[in-house]
């Protein structure tokens, strides 16, 4: 009789771009390395459950996973306090894959905490699950939650809210900050998930916490079986505490044990200080031009011009010229 395969224990946090076409490879990278099939897959839709168009948003997310990742997600339909039933807990407890994303972190965390879903998610990470939490949902998994809407839209500086503390495996209180490098404000600071660096520092003043800052269009994956975390995407991930800062870039990985109960961070200035997983040396390149142009467009819209220019230079290097006309980018092979 064939032994039952144990389920992988993986948690991925997205800074943004969780349903962008160019981020599909981040999901595939995880799924391709699994030891078990993903059969019971859920969309935890609470963060945007208060929105009138929540069913439309659910459908868009389900369509993305079906077409880009080849995963069918069942919407949990836990959109409000009144909608909760014990079946929701049962479904989460038996899930193979759980995705949750945009919306209000405080709206979601209040409902999840009331029904002990934080403990359910912790137990799932112990027994085996792939969790992908992005934006608002990612915010809820720390010891504390930033009340983003309340601060950014209303100006209510009420302080941090209680989080689910799913990242307690790090052995330290955490605050997760997606959209860490946001620049949409233009003439005012919208980094640190739209509230700005100054307001964020005021929120954590006096707290002994690790701030996990995840740049936009960037993912941080914790593989609890291998005790490894790695970063993929356009930006960086920052682990910041009173003692210092650790910076992980695209392609970097590090042992989770370096940021646990004996947390003694050092400011990482040299890439060689990190444990890097490098691909084998290859002597040819197969470029997906349209995907690169899409990433470049995202970088330009986010004012990440250095990345945009590097993509242009890379394409030129391999004989591809690109031309920007208003909102349209075209390309052609160089003679």
Tell me the role of every PLM-derived stretch.
Residues 2-37, 48, 52, 56-59, ...:
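C-terminal and late-domain segments of enzyme folds
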Residues 99-102, 125-145:
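Catalytic nucleophile loop
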Residues 33, 91, 116-128:
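Catalytic-core regions built around general acid/base machinery
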Residues 105-115, 186-187:
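Glycine/threonine-rich flexible loop motifs
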Residues 269-335:
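Structural preference for alpha-helix termini/caps and helix-kink/transition segments
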Residues 48-107:
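Portal/gating segments that form or line small-molecule/metal binding sites
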